[in-house]
Amino acid sequence: MNLQTDTLLSGYKIIQDKDAFMFGIDAVLLSNFAFSSIKLRDSGLDLGTGNGIIPLLLVDKVVHITGLEIQEKSAELAQKSLELNNLEEKIQIVKGDIKNVQTLFAKHAYDFVTSNPPYMISEHGKENPADEKAIARHEVLCKLEDVISAAEYLLKPHGKFFMIHRPFRLAEIFNCLQKYKLEPKRMCLVSPFAASEPNLVLIEARKNAQSRLKIEPEIIVYEKPGVYTERVKAIYKEMALK
């Protein structure tokens, strides 16, 4: 492993492997999207937590947050990060499979669930199942329905599910959410530039909720190549990243 330790503005440190999948803007946008809707008394679970960035970004907003990660190296780094920050009482890292949440966690125990899942459909097993980056990007070890069914199992009645994904899969996402009684309540599209087609979508769904969807103003990431817009700069600042 090629490790580096980064310090967030909050003072928390995160250990990352430069040769593996390091956190990017997706995790920051998802954390901020959830941040505006969760409460201090809440407890949550992050499905596919990777190196634990989402628990680290949300830890001061909640009572407790658990990160579930199937890849052993990523889970170990997440555990080292929480120990480095003395956050063992507020964050728990569990090494396990999203498809096995029923054997790992109590049913309907969490106020919210977050997930930054693999976006791309696996191309008939072409991806290497041992490749950490392939696992993070493609549905090698879990599919969209696995993530959504796990969220339904974990959430309390009226609990909230926050996910970031690709807009081209929106119809599939909404169909699957409603299949598991998770009603889409809030959505925000994300585009790289003002003239670009959206390439990300943030979704909040609530368990057993009435049907009414709020579309939030689109997030434009870059003002010009390499320069974040004022809105994205504000998001990074709010999440104590820059």
Question: How does the language model describe each region?
Answer:
Residues L8, L87-E88, K181, I215:
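Short, structurally constrained coil/turn elements
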Residues N32-K126, S149:
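Conserved SAM/SAH cofactor-binding pocket of Class I
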Residues P198-K242:
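SAM/dcSAM-binding transferase cores
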